[in-house]
Every structure is written in C-alpha cells, then in structure tokens.
Amino acid sequence: MSRGLGDVYKRQMLLMGCGQTSVPDEIADSSEKKESSVEPEKNGEEPVLQKVTLNEVAHSIFYAPMYVAIEEGYFKDAGIDLDLVTGFGADKVMTAVLSGEADIGFMGPETTVYTANEGSKDPVINFAQLTQRAGNFLVAREEMNDFKWSDLIGEDVLGGRAGGMPEMVFEYILKQNGIEPSEVNIDQSIDFGSTGAAFTGGQGAYTVEFEPGATLLEQEKAGYVVASLGVDSGYVPYTAFSAKQSYMKKHPDVIQAFTNALQQGMEYVNTHTPEEIAASIQTQFSETDTATITTIIRRYQKQDTWKRDLVFSEDSFTLLLDILESAGQLEKRPDYQDVVTTEYAEKALQ
C-alpha cells in the first residue's frame, strides 16, 4: 500500500470511528427550541439532566441531523446528558442495547427484525427513522461516465457483510436491474469499515463505500464514484433509533425528549445550507476540513437523504421486509406494530 493510499484509509477510519463519547458542557444554541425538558428548571436553578447512552452503528456524516442536535445543544435543552458511543456494527449496537449497556441504539432496523423473529421477550422497538436513502456509493478504480449496473457482471466487488443493509440494498439494486447477485463476484468477508483499506490495497475492481470514504478516495485519485446506491434503490428506511420495550415503558419522557431534540436536528439540516451544517458538526469530524464535510453534505442533500420528520411509516417497513426477503434473510414477516412505534415521532411534530 502506498503512503498516500494508506493515509486515505487512516483518515477514513478516524472519521468513521472517532466520535465524541459525551456532549460538551457548553454548546451555543442558534435555533428555536421545543419545550421538552425531562425535568424542568426549578426556582432559576439549572435543570437536572437525564443521562442517556446512545450507541451508534458508525460515526459518519451520513447521520448529520443527529450531530447537529448534539452540537446545537438540542439534547441538553431537552434535559438529556447524551453519552455517544460508536459500536462499529449493527450487531454490536444491538448487543449493547439488549445487555443494557446502551439505552438507545442507532442502526439499520433490519437488526430489530432479526431480534423480533428470535422471539425476544423484551423486543427492541424502532421509534424514529433518520435516513430514507442508502448512504453508500459504488466506487470504481477509473472514471466511468456511462456506468451501467450491468458493467458489474463478472467483476469483483467489495460489498458488505451478509444480512446487513449495505449488502442487501446492493443486491436489491442488482435484481432491480435484472442482474442476479451470483453473476457478480461479491466479497462479503470484509467489514464495511475496512473495505476502503482493502480497495486501496488492490482488492476488487469496485467497492461499496460510505462517506467520508468515497470522497476521500476521490480526493486521492484512488477511486471514483460511479453510482449512488441511495438514488438507485429508492426510498429505504436505512437507519433508525430504537430501544427495548421495557426502557420505553419506564422512560417515555426520555424517549419523547430525545425524539424532540432529533426533530430539531432534522429541521436544521432541511433549512440550512451545506456550509452551515458543516460548520455546525465540524467538531464531530475534526480529522477533516470543513470544505470536505461540506462536499459530503451537499451530496447527501442532493439525493434527499434525510426525512422531514422521524415517522417510520408502515410502507417503509413493508419495503424493508421486501428487501430482507429478497436477500433470503427473512424467516418470517413480523407485524409492523411489534417493532415500530410512531407515537414519539408524531408528537415531536406538534
């Protein structure tokens, strides 16, 4: 691996994995706040903050609304002292939620479907959907202005782990274009956080990359984005927030306050420029410059990545099950109400 390409991988891993593990004590607020404190201020005293541990599947600009809610102080104003931990994989996030190590998980909702089908007595329920498109891109070694999905037939592609949303959405797109996944040599042995290193090391003719990996590869002339999985797959419930049913019953006020803060983050990214959003979340991605963050946000905004609200609709859930079924990863189709609630997201809009 050349020094330059090695730097690409190091930068990618730092940007995807080095999230803050706690919220700064003082964060300036520049937007209107919802009155949603968990424990209101009394007699002019500072409100008591509720500690909440959130385990995220990865640390990526793809999840900008959440980081805006942190950096603009929305969680703190909602009465929440947020401890953000990066789990590096949906399976690890789910393990943290089930064990009680995390109060809330942020991951692909397919993981909650798997858990429900295993017959969990304390199911993990999705209560807020953040992204409505896939956040990854197909990267080739050379520029391809006239790329067609059929170009992948017979080629080596670094995909993602079997059963994960990146891999399943990729296979879904292939099938939508009349291509059987077996016609493509898909490497499912590499974790999505390591595909960039494998690609720069010479593996694969193509790789499926999240941001900032895709942009970093382009900046170093090591790869070129030829297709957006988010655009070509259509609207997909890619990532959502979830918690154990028992936690939600015990702390409905915390879940509501958390959702209210997230909704403010959603409204921010949908009403501000890429430059303004980049400036807001810069400290979450200190290993990269604001210009690069802006480029990535503009790419995500252009493809309508973020919802206007956090409501996880039944239509979206049905599409998720269809994708899982198409990938051969669904034993049975759980009922919508068993793994999704829209109560908190709908109230956050009021």
Q: Locations of the language-model features?
A:
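Short, glycine-/small- and polar/acidic-enriched structural segments
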Residues: 27-29, 33-35, 39-179, 186-189, ...
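Pocket-lining segment of extracytoplasmic ligand-binding domains
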Residues: 111, 142, 193-285
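Conserved C-terminal helix/tail region of periplasmic/extracytoplasmic solute-binding proteins
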Residues: 318-350
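Secondary-structure end/capping motifs
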Residues: 249-331
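Bacterial signal peptide processing site
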Residues: 19-21
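Short, solvent-exposed loop/beta-turn-alpha elements that line the ligand-binding surface or hinge
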Residues: 77, 150, 231-233, 303-312
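Single conserved hydrophobic/aromatic residue that forms the stacking wall/gate
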Residues: 1-12
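C-terminal motif of bacterial Sec signal peptides marking the signal peptidase cleavage site
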Residues: 14-17
